[in-house]
Structures are given as structure tokens and as C-alpha cells.
Amino acid sequence: MSQENSVHRSSTKKTPIKIAFIHPDLGIGGAERLVVDAAVGLQSLGKEVVVFTSHCDKKHCFEEIRDGTIKVKVYGDWLPSSIFGRLSIFCSSLRQVYLTMILLTNYMHFDAIIVDQLSTCVPFLLLASQMILFYCHFPDKYLAKRGGILKKLYRIPFDTVEAESVRLADRIVVNSKFTASVFKKAFPKIRKPLRIVHPCVDIEAASKPLEFQLPEKILQRKLLISVNRFERKKDIRLAIDAFSALRDLSANRFPEYLLLVAGGYDIRVSENRRYLKELQEFCEQKDLSYTTVKDNWDNITVAPSTNVLFLLSVPSKVRDALISSSRILLYTPENEHFGIVPLEAMLRKVPVLAQTNGGPLETVIDGKNGWLRPRDAKIWGNVIYEATTSTTYDTAAMGEAGSEWVKNEFSTDAMARKFESEIMSGIRSITPEKRLMRRVNGLLAVFVLFMLFWGTCIIAATVPFAIIKLYFAQTYSSVKLGFMLGTCIVSVSFLTFTVYAKLTNL
């Protein structure tokens, strides 16, 4: 159904605008939280929303999905998400293309489609007439772990597909100014304007009574909290180092403090296990006693001598109680894409101490609802000391200011209205002439993707034979021929799209 018909229909017969989301894996994470919040928000504005995904486990998803608040369609879960723990981006792309084919052949009634994380499906969607909005949490090429020469060669076609498919979207939206700057660096040839729609937090959550009560012995301490997954890139070590620096400034009163290190922890993830051990060893180096809690939340016991309390994979109700009872949130990640945790803390009137880079530059107003300081443990320790022992900072007023700031700027309604504005302006921008050009672009891009896929497969297939040829030299000519054929196909694909992009100024 065409966009003109859709808009005309909605304006005359009051039929709601229909919106589809395409998301790879609808689990529990920041990207998934945004999709859920956006879907719920758009529904509250009268839109009909369906989320399409390749995987959704009802035992491991957000409540709005589990209770049916959001309509979810799952297709392609039977396809592998990886092959022997590898080729995950290849499998994810394949699953998304399959999902897109189902959507295009069975669900043609949508007015707009929002794609996030993976953009492989965008060229295929151009074959229809729906407006396409791509939401970039962070460029995938920078998220992927880099390896040796083979990994770099493997990533080339997928990084190229990401760049060329993203540029075909009608609207490109990012989650922060920081991500926008990284996006421009990652894709310098994309000239389309970038819109910013910040993630949101549940404003009503702060007005509800806490469902969990911390033990009195913990509440008697001056609590500082760090909430992050147990990953090195989150730089939790900085919080412990700053806490140690606090002792140098206030040795006599230091026993009054307790550092809470809470976050996502999966024992199956080796990095989680290793990093927790590193942090515990760092506590020992700094002569800080610690206790680790991973269950039995109703009976948390902490000795008076404990300085650091590690809390692994805390339930939401416990997490809310921990944040609400803390004096300061120590938000340690460097160059974080956006950062939801600072918003959650400010909503509960807890000031935030963060680094002078990344997403917090857009959420933390230095001196008003928190502090922005360089990565220096002594500087951080001094801020903690002054905020908790002197009148230098009115932390109560900062907490109130932070709560109002979040309620006004980062509510679900505010985010939904920004999405609605981008969607409606995108729909109106698609003229009949533009629709024809979109389909031409889509056909060409699908052809290039098809060629890239088979060319890459041919090249990949020759690698094991190239190794075998060391023992069976007679097969080398066939291997060489196959490698050359695959290389030619990939090269022609790149050349075709490059020339076309230049001619059409994509």
C-alpha cells in the first residue's frame, strides 16, 4: 500500500498509522529496552505497532513482551545464530533477510518500518513502499571484536554492507550526539542528516514504593554505587580506585562508607568471571575488604569491616533499592554511547559522577545534577569527599534538579513523540518519483548483496582447500581458480555499487 494512500486513509478515516520494528534478538539489554519503550510509547499515541524478530524467549524478555502489551512476531529462529561459535554476523544477516522476506510477502500493510542494530534488510525493504527509519545505537563495525588477517578479511564485506545499506534508509536516527560523531567518522560518505532521539526511562517507576528493603546495617552506611555489567570496558576499577583515594582524604570516617558494585554477571561468560576476579584482587591490593553476594537477596549480611560489596546480577527490585539509598552514582565507562543508568539514578534523586566524554555529556549537567570529571581517581575521590562531608555541594538540591531534568527530557512520552515526528515527516517526504528511485536503489543493492554473499562464500570455501593443497599439490590450480572467481565477483559488486552511488549521489 502506498504512503499517500496510508496518510490519506489515516487523516480521513482515522485509521491509525501502522508501524513495524525489525530487531535481531529481543532479549534483555539496552537496545531491546529502547525498542520496547518506543513501541509502548507509539502505541500510547494511537499507533498500531508490531515487533518482528528472529528470536524471543518469553522467559528472558521484558515484561511488556511477556504480558502481551506489545505484539511480537518471530520468524527464522530455526536458522543458526552462529556456526561452531563463529560467523555470527553472517548468521545474523541471513536470519534478518529471511525475516524480511516473510514480512514483505505476508505483512504489506505497514506505513513505516523501524530497523535497528542490523541494517542488512534495508535494501530489501526498499522493494516495497514503506518509509524506513534506521536507528543506530552504535556502528556495528566498531562493536565487532577485531582479530587477525582472516577476521579482517571476513569483516570487509559486512562492514561494506552496513555502510551501503544504512545510507539507503529514508531516515537515520542515533541515540546521542556522541554516537552521531562516531557515526560520521565510521561512514563519512553518508551525507544524510542525522536525527537524535535519546533513550528514555520509566518516569512512573520513581513514584512507586520500593518493593525491597535493604538491611538497616547497610542503610546506616554512606552508600556509593556503581552499576554496570562486569566487563573491562565499563572500567569499574576506577570506582574502586576512587573509593581508595577517599580513604586518604578521610581515614577516620572511612568505615562509615560502603561501595556497592552491582551489575550484570553471567557465570557462562568468561570475561565476567575474569573481570570480577581482577576487581577482587584489586581490592586486596588497595587493602579494601570485600564481600560478594550473588543470591539470597532477602538475607544480605555485611560485616562492619566490609568496604566493598559486590552484587552479581541483582534483581530489578533490589537494584532500585540500592540506587535509591545511595549518595552518589559512580558512572565509570569511558566514551559510553549514551548510558541509561545515570538517568535512572537522577530520576531517584541521586547525583551522578561521570567521565568528561561520551553520552554523560548530554545527560549530566556539571554542578547541577552531578559532576563531570576526567579519569583520575584522586579527583573523583575528592568530589566524593566534598559531596558527602562538606557544604560545598547541595546534593539534595542536585538530586531534585536531576529528577526534574529526567522527567522533562527523557520520558517515554517525549521519546515517542520524537519518533512520531520523524516517522510522519519521513512518510510525507516520499514522493512518487522518490518511490521509483528507492525501488531502483533497492534492486541494485539486493543484486550487490547477492553477489557479495556468493563471492564471499566462494572465497571462504577455497581457504581449507588452500591448506590441503600443501599435501595435495595437484588441487592447487582449482583452488586458485575458485579464489580468483570469488575475488572477481566481490570486486565487481563493490565497483558496481560505487559507480552507481557516485552517479546518483546516494
Curated annotation (Swiss-Prot):
EC number: 2.4.1.132, 2.4.1.257
SUPFAM superfamilies documented for this protein: UDP-Glycosyltransferase/glycogen phosphorylase
Keyword Glycosyltransferase set for record: yes
Topology in the lipid bilayer: Multi-pass membrane protein
Glycosylation sites: N299
Keyword hit for Nucleotide-binding: no
Reaction equation(s) it catalyzes: a beta-D-Man-(1->4)-beta-D-GlcNAc-(1->4)-alpha-D-GlcNAc-diphospho-di-trans,poly-cis-dolichol + GDP-alpha-D-mannose = an alpha-D-Man-(1->3)-beta-D-Man-(1->4)-beta-D-GlcNAc-(1->4)-alpha-D-GlcNAc-diphospho-di-trans,poly-cis-dolichol + GDP + H(+); an alpha-D-Man-(1->3)-beta-D-Man-(1->4)-beta-D-GlcNAc-(1->4)-alpha-D-GlcNAc-diphospho-di-trans,poly-cis-dolichol + GDP-alpha-D-mannose = an alpha-D-Man-(1->3)-[alpha-D-Man-(1->6)]-beta-D-Man-(1->4)-beta-D-GlcNAc-(1->4)-alpha-D-GlcNAc-diphospho-di-trans,poly-cis-dolichol + GDP + H(+)
InterPro entries: ALG2, Glyco_trans_1, Glyco_trans_4-like_N
Residue intervals passing through the bilayer: 82-104, 118-138, 443-463, 481-501
Pathway(s) this gene product operates in, as recorded in its UniProt entry: Protein modification; protein glycosylation
Gene Ontology biological process terms in this record: dolichol-linked oligosaccharide biosynthetic process
GO MF: alpha-1,3-mannosyltransferase activity; GDP-Man:Man1GlcNAc2-PP-Dol alpha-1,3-mannosyltransferase activity; GDP-Man:Man2GlcNAc2-PP-dolichol alpha-1,6-mannosyltransferase activity
GO cellular component: cytoplasmic side of endoplasmic reticulum membrane; endomembrane system
Cell location: Endoplasmic reticulum membrane
Annotated function: Mannosylates Man(2)GlcNAc(2)-dolichol diphosphate and Man(1)GlcNAc(2)-dolichol diphosphate to form Man(3)GlcNAc(2)-dolichol diphosphate.
PANTHER family in alphabetical order: ALPHA-1,3/1,6-MANNOSYLTRANSFERASE ALG2, ALPHA-1,3_1,6-MANNOSYLTRANSFERASE ALG2
Protein's name in the database: Alpha-1,3/1,6-mannosyltransferase alg2
Organism: Schizosaccharomyces pombe (strain 972 / ATCC 24843) (Fission yeast)
